[in-house]
From Swiss-Prot:
The lineage of its organism: Bacteria, Pseudomonadati, Pseudomonadota, Gammaproteobacteria, Lysobacterales. GTP binds at D19, H20, G21, K22, S23, T24, N136, K137, I138, D139. GO terms for biological process: positive regulation of translation. It catalyses: GTP + H2O = GDP + phosphate + H(+). The gene is lepA. It comes from Xylella fastidiosa (strain M12). This is Elongation factor 4.
Length: 602
């Protein structure tokens, strides 16, 4: 090693759109550097979570430290952080990039640039990173490297003349990627202070070790036995062990400046080491914390309730442990008349919500009911106060509301020219307003302002179906905008079910109410009495359907006989049904709560 220990360190992330081959390229890099032996190698070795492997997507950013002997004869220490590509997990990307000096932008040579590659690349450029374009999948017969290079220059605006063309699947030319990393990505720079500063990139909970933190040491060094100060909480913890992932966990004697590794300090409190925080020495603290990364705001809210009320404390504990590993998750206790005690949770999007529910059910063995997701609205009350509302059931009475504002997003859609008409039609159906259309080589960029409520539910699926899977979407929050919104309540036998309330645009209210009643009629099982399902805005009923009662034939045993005998039996049955209806409760199945989702948002 040279006299400057940081000179031969390279910290880099891999950024790309979903399915462009990030994780496969990471596998090849690990293989070439000898991080794992051949028998330990498996596809997508960094996607360690079973849900990631099943869905074929990366959810959590993973890190790995490798040694590489370059063609110039020197040994280089490479720290690779694999990042997710889905729009819901873009915050994971920005966290990973904060710990790097460079990024590999992987583009599928057969598909060209897609929206998420653009968004992630802009994030990298904003943070001042060196971006190295990589063209992947050149082994495919449909690969067109020249077109992909032209698109990178036209759509993203970075020079692609020196882009490295590889096939991550076969390993062709991957060595050139390693050389490009060594030559083009800068080494870590010393900070303006001599004192220890380490940025927490990620944390997770281990039942034996407590909180394990993944850190990037910016300045100074961490050795076991040091007392570390967590700068935001002001608490000190003694370091038990430090090390790196190779991708296996490997213990080291110390972590020095420029390195990315893990630290354990017997922190048993789940909130002990928040992500984005700075670690420094208790005895000699740094003057100020490192700039962290933006707090991410959840956009989609839903209620999570345990099927069995006794699981409530377990659900709280599971959510706290998951929150440590997933900084974007928010939750607060909620009480629902229909569902009992549970939590109101905030997510980044529908995929994030599905993944969280799946992780809770699998990793913590919980049985959960989820209510229909909703976005956050702003309500301006008549007394001038502005309240944020993430739960339709908590909306103030109509006479106290001055205006309701919904969140508007700006979406960038990249699509082949053949499907522009279909994309515009879809956006207009979703109450969108067009900002502009730009033709870029073989792709068209369509920019729209759209209501977030229309986008989070099923917009992505519909966009894929109208463009046969070719379009890609990226969006970010813009502002809140006033509109004519109402709350549609669902009444079952005259009782309002708070978990089924939805906020909709006034023009869509009657249709949504009618469709909801029809859907619920199919899902609620028949009872011994008629069940009335009504949709209402305030006290005005806008639609109704009835689940007919099951009826026992009480006249079966009266063969002939007097008509008054039959009348008496029928009257008796009628009385019983009336009494049953007064005290009878209707069990609402889980499917009924999700029926709100399935109503087509035309």
């Amino acid at each position: 090693m040279s006299s400057d220990p940081m000179r031969n360190i390279r910290n880099f992330s891999i950024i790309a759109h979903v399915d462009h081959g990030k994780s496969t390229l990471a596998d090849r890099i690990i293989q070439l550097c000898g991080g794992l032996e051949a028998r330990e190698m498996e596809a997508q070795v960094l996607d360690s979570n079973p849900i990631e492997r099943e869905r074929g997507i990366t959810i959590k950013a993973q890190s790995v430290s490798l040694l590489y002997k370059a063609q110039d004869g020197q040994n280089y220490h490479l720290n690779l952080i694999d990042t997710p590509g889905h729009v819901d997990f873009s915050y994971e990307v920005s966290r990973s990039l904060a710990a790097c000096e460079g990024a590999l932008l992987v583009v599928d040579a057969s598909q060209g640039v897609e929206a998420q590659s653009v968004a992630n690349c802009y994030t990298a450029v904003e943070q001042g990173l060196e971006v190295v374009p990589i063209l992947n999948k050149i082994d495919l017969p449909t690969a067109d490297t020249e077109r992909a290079k032209a698109e990178i220059e036209a759509v993203i605006g970075i020079d692609a003349s020196e882009a490295v063309a590889v096939s991550a699947k076969t390993g062709l030319y991957v060595e050139q990627v390693l050389e490009a990393i060594v030559q083009r990505i800068p080494a870590p720079q010393p900070r303006d202070t001599e004192k220890l500063q380490a940025l927490i990139i990620d944390s997770w909970f281990d039942n034996y070790l407590g909180v394990v933190s993944l850190v990037r040491v910016m300045q100074g060094e961490i050795t076991p036995g040091n007392k570390l100060l967590v700068m935001s909480t002001g608490r000190s913890h003694q370091v038990d062990a430090v090390g790196v992932f190779t991708p296996k966990r490997k213990t080291l004697a110390k972590l020095t400046a420029g390195e990315v590794g893990w630290v354990t300090a017997s922190i048993k409190d789940v909130h002990g080491a928040p992500v984005g925080d700075t670690l420094t020495l208790t005895s000699d603290p740094a003057p100020k914390p490192l700039p962290g990364f933006q707090e991410v705001q959840p956009r989609v809210f839903a209620g999570l309730f345990p099927v069995d009320a006794e699981d409530y404390p377990d659900l709280r504990e599971a959510l706290e442990k998951l929150r440590l590993n997933d900084a974007a998750l928010r939750f607060e206790p909620e009480n629902s008349e229909a569902m009992g005690f549970g939590f109101r949770c905030g997510f980044l999007g529908m995929l994030h919500m599905e993944i969280v529910q799946e992780r809770l059910e699998r990793e913590y063995d919980l049985n959960l009911i989820t209510t229909a997701p909703t976005v956050i609205y702003e309500v301006l009350k008549t007394d001038g106060t502005l309240v944020a509302m993430d739960n339709p059931a908590k909306m103030p009475p109509i006479n106290q509301i001055n205006e309701i504002r919904e969140p508007i997003i700006r979406s960038n859609i990249l699509t082949p020219p053949d499907y522009v008409g279909a994309v515009i039609t879809l956006c207009e159906e979703k109450r969108g307003s067009q900002i502009g259309i730009t033709y870029l080589g073989n792709q068209v960029q369509v920019a729209y302002e759209l209501p977030m409520a229309e986008v989070v539910l099923d917009f992505f699926d519909k966009l894929k179906s109208v463009t046969r899977g070719y379009a890609s979407l990226d969006y970010h929050f813009l502002r809140f905008q006033e509109g004519p919104f109402v709350r549609v309540d669902t009444l079952i036998n005259g009782d309002r079910v708070d978990a089924l309330s939805v906020i909709v645009h006034r023009h869509q209210a009657e249709r949504r109410g009618r469709e909801l009643c029809e859907k619920m009629k199919d899902l609620i099982p028949r009872q011994m009495f008629d069940v009335a399902i009504q949709a209402a805005i305030g006290s005005q009923i806008i639609s109704r359907s009835t689940v007919k009662a099951m009826r026992k034939n009480v006249l079966a045993k009266c063969y002939g006989g007097d008509i008054s005998r039959k009348k008496k039996l029928l009257e008796k049955q009628k009385e019983g049904k009336k009494r049953m209806k007064q005290i009878g409760r209707v069990e609402i199945p889980q499917e009924a709560f999700l029926a709100v989702l399935q109503i087509d948002n035309k």
